[in-house]
């Protein structure tokens, strides 16, 4: 589900499933919806669920053990609203060409998932004149620098 569309995603999954399909949880980095408790974003419920999991699953370390943590970065590149579409069109080819070893997904921007588990997502802001870069990698600075160069060139071409 794309960022900003949690409720639409919940409805889509329910409609696509069978009569017994349940969506237990939907989230963005700053929004958590526990559908059994309601259709609203609920941080207090998230705290309660996490507390229960910590108590029943052997502590926070046990919950975190299967997760590989990598540095994460979000960066914004200035881009006039009227240039976003052209910049993103160019990035559909340019970003994968720069990171050819990765798998590409263009559902919600341009995302490249790399064999080492790192990833970069480039998408236009829906509210501000920026193209956003989101990345997670052991060397996140290098990945962001590479993406920034590609995004900067696409924005420059789109504004000229």
Predicted regions and their residues:
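Phosphate-binding and adjacent anionic-ligand microenvironments
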Residues: 1-134, 140-141, 145-160
